[in-house]
Amino acid sequence: MKVLVVGSGGREHAIVTSISKSDKVSKIYCAPGNAGIAALAECVDIGVMDFDRLVAFAKEKEIDLVVVAPDDPLVAGAVDAFEAAGIRAFGPRANAAIIEGSKAFSKDLMKKYGIPTAAYENFTDADSALKYLETASFPIVLKADGLALGKGVLICNDLEEAKAGVKEIMLDKHFGSAGNTMVIEEFMTGREVSVLCFCDGTTIKPMTSAQDHKRAKDGDQGLNTGGMGTFSPSPFYTKEIDEYCMENIYKPTMAAMKAEGREFKGVLFCGLMMTPNGVKVLEYNARFGDPEAQVVLPRMKNDIIDVMEACIDGTLDKVDLQFEDNAAVCVVLASDGYPVSYKKGYPISGLEKFDGKDDYFVFHAGTKFDGDQIVTNGGRVLGVTAKGKDLFEARANAYAATEWITFENKYIRSRRSAPPVR
């Protein structure tokens, strides 16, 4: 079969890597792809939001399955566009992807169906938000309602910070129209964990757990980013917690979406907080996480095509999801200055050192070809993933492998700053 993957980052490189292992697949295309993906797939210069050209390409090449990976096209209806043209597509339709596309929608859904989450209020005008904050307890969390590249969340320690946050999100439109509505949420404490789940509209099957580091700087300081590294599994996500989440979060979320006429098929990313008062939902995403996919997919034993087709066909209940009994750690190699401002176009060397090494992966995020040289082309440049028998070995292997790669403004969070893995 012929597969088209839509996207261009490290997540898409991990997805393409998994698809390339399937005996069922004869040809992979990726639109637009990147310099690393080009080693496994034919990259096509079509943007992720150019639905007309994507559909036309899929028809022309007689694509059997399209995998839509990023949030923007999913929320905008990419799967709907492919399905309308009679092309099988993996991912939620727009009316289900709203669970990520609108934080206000997802919070209201959880409230309506009794799914545990933080207390919150939604606001559509800045004055009301500012008035609410006058009597609020701090710290408090402000969230832009719409998509903001994973950066539309502000944790405010006092009223002054919160006022500045309202101005940034709602008045200055720092996140564009994503800030037309804003969610103000109680600040939760505890350990965060991410659980990606395959869904077929009725059945939901969690993958192995993961935990990511969002802060840009060492010691969990600096601005929130799309993710500076991640590890899997989370040692804090126990069998008992998994069973609780299945009965109180995962299954109820699937049932809630179905009851709302928004059947969810694809990958549901559940961002959870393990608080002193139990596990609560921080956020939902309607797709594989980045960089979570880069540690979860390398540990999956199943043929990913079998699982994706089961999600589309509504037969996920017949799939036995299996993961290796080991660990994986991904360290992001970023451009110094990310996520604010950074230079790009620097040549990258050492990529060939990953060739033929089964338990080491280098997933390209912000790279491109400059002639026949691979150069940096983004804030998050590469994700170096390594496996090990446990998290300690995997982390040591991953940090050792980051030394194999050099480029001029390379930045990683130091091993010393990585949160403990026990």
Question: How would you label these PLM feature ranges?
Answer:
Residues 156-293:
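Internal nucleotide-binding/catalytic subdomain
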Residues 38-41, 55, 98-104, 217-218:
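Short, charged, surface-exposed secondary-structure boundary motifs
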